[in-house]
Every structure is written in C-alpha cells, then in structure tokens.
C-alpha cells in the first residue's frame, strides 16, 4: 500500500522534452543495433497515439526513413483519412493509401460479423450500422454483458444483449480489420527492409486493448510505457495538429461511432489512467475514487475491472509455447 504520495493527476506529469529524447534515442538504437533495419513503417489512423509515434520516429530517424500507411475500409470514420493525411503532411513523411475493403470482403469479415449479429437480431440487414457496447459499468450488475446497437437506414436504433456465441463471433470477424492492416504494414516493411512500429499506450497495452497478431504485432512499441494522459502531453510538446489532439479517442472499428469508453475502458481515459496508476502503485481504492470523483464502491469496481482485464488478456501477451527450448544461451 502506498502511504506517501498524494494521488492526483499531477503524478502523471512528465518532462516532455526528456521523455521524447529518451524515446528517440531508444528508437535509433533499437533500429540500428537490434533490428538492423533501414527505417520504419506504421499505420496512421488520425489518432493521438499513431501521430505521436510518427513524430518521434521522424525526430529519431529523419522523415525520409518513415513511411506512413493510410488503411481505411468501408466502415471507417470520415475523419480518419483527413486526420491521417494531416499528420503525414505536417511531418513531411512519405505516405501510401491502402484501402483494405476488398480484402475484408474476400475474407468474409462483414458477412461473418452480420451473421453473428443475426443470432440476436434476426432482422439485421447489410445496410444497417452497428457497434457493440458495455453498460455503464459504475452502475451495472456485477458482471456487465455486451450489447449490440443497430441503426436502420431511417435512423431507428435497436439494442440487444449479446450471447457469448454472438459476441465472440462479432469480435472474431471484426479482428480481420486489425490483422489485415498489420499484414499490409509487414508487406511494406519487408520490401523496404524497414521495421514495423506499434503505437499502443500503457493503458491499452497493459489492459489488453489490442488484437493478437493484429495491432498488437510490431517490432518496437515506443510509447507502451506511457499512460494516455502522458501521450497527450507529449503530443502538445511535439506540436501534433490541434485537430488531432482534440479528437475523442475512438475504436473506429464499427460503422456506428463508438468511444473507447463505451467499448472497453468504462471511464474516460484520464480517469482510467489515474485508476490504473493507483492500482499499480498500491493506492487503496478509496484514494483512487477521491482523485477521480468516484465513490469508494465505484473505485473498487474499477479496480476489479482492471484486475479482470489483466487476467483475461494475459494470453494476448504470451509468446508461442514450445515443448522444449530451441535457442539456448551460449555456454
């Protein structure tokens, strides 16, 4: 239990210049001495994380050795391309457009997802929009269930609780999107002798908010140790365009607008960051609640959520299991 530091948003403060310098040095060293690659490839979503990582790579390697990829699909937000181009242009890096819609259609991504939705909403049509959401975790039953929200072409929304089979089917089909993007990233990395850079922040990385062998795959992850609050502070220091810094964090996975809060984290990122920090540093839940405006009971719920996500997503962090060790240390 932490009995010395007063818990407040100030505990997540950083010296942005020093943090940036350390990350840039690490990128350069990793690329040259460990990965032995000429440059880096990364997907640009128009979000804060990929924008910050791109800027750090440019500062470390030079714009000429950074390739940004735009990889929209049929259900991507209209903001995605605009903001992704904005960051690429502001950094002066080469960029390429790879529309992954044909690949997803060929793999049955949309069809498989729609079939899963019809297990709970048989009238669902291809023209409808959808997303999956959690209930308000702070006031929900002990074990919250996901629901699917469907919007018809005339704007009418319907909501239905998902069975385990339907939920897993929707998620499995949607994961084609992240895995397809990563496949494209590695294609360009292979042809250029570049490394693939991942863009998770600590909240996402530690809580398993990524797809195994999808956006979770990368050769280096420069900001995985930084809470999202700290990434925003770094973005300001790096002069990331204001339009990107002011954008609400989104999954940009489903055809209906969806925040990360309603899909996965239960709280806005600044409060979730502080709760995760408090849990990691041994603060009692009542102090986390006081620092984030939650009741003691609500803070306890968030602590349980943090622990359950750690346990449930441990598999995502695991390397392939070998029966016997293959590479042994030299004697």
Question: Where is each model-derived feature located?
Answer:
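Acidic, Mg2+-coordinating phosphoryl-transfer loop and its flanking beta/alpha structural elements
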Residues: 72
């Amino acid at each position: 239990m932490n009995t010395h530091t007063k818990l407040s948003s100030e505990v997540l403060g950083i010296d942005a210049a020093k943090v940036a310098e350390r990350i840039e040095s690490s990128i350069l060293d990793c690329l040259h001495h460990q990965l032995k690659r000429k440059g880096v490839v990364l997907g640009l979503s128009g979000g804060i994380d990929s924008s910050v990582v791109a800027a750090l790579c440019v500062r470390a390697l030079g714009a000429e050795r950074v390739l940004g990829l735009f990889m929209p699909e049929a259900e991507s937000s209209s903001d995605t391309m605009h903001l992704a181009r904005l960051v690429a242009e502001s950094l002066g890096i080469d960029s390429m457009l790879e529309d992954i819609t044909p690949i997803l259609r060929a793999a049955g991504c949309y069809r498989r997802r729609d079939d899963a939705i019809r297990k709970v909403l048989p009238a669902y049509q291809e023209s409808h929009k959808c997303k999956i959401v959690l209930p308000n975790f702070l006031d929900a039953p002990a074990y919250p269930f996901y629901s699917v929200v469907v919007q018809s072409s005339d704007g009418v929304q319907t909501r239905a609780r998902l069975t385990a089979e339907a939920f897993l089917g929707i998620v499995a089909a949607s994961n084609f999107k992240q895995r397809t993007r990563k496949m494209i990233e590695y294609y360009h990395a292979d042809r250029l002798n570049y490394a693939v850079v991942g863009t998770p922040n600590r909240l996402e990385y530690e809580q398993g908010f990524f797809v195994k062998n999808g956006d979770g795959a990368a050769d280096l992850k420069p900001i995985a140790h930084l809470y999202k609050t700290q990434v925003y502070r770094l973005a300001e220091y790096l002069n990331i365009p204001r339009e990107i810094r002011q954008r609400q964090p989104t999954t940009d996975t489903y055809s209906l607008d969806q925040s990360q809060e309603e899909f996965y984290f239960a709280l806005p990122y600044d409060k979730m960051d502080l709760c995760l920090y408090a849990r990691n540093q041994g603060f009692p839940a009542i102090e986390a609640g006081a620092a984030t405006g939650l009741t003691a009971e609500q803070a306890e719920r968030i602590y349980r959520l943090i622990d359950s996500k750690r346990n449930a997503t441990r598999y995502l962090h695991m390397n392939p299991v070998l029966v016997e060790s293959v590479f042994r240390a030299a004697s």
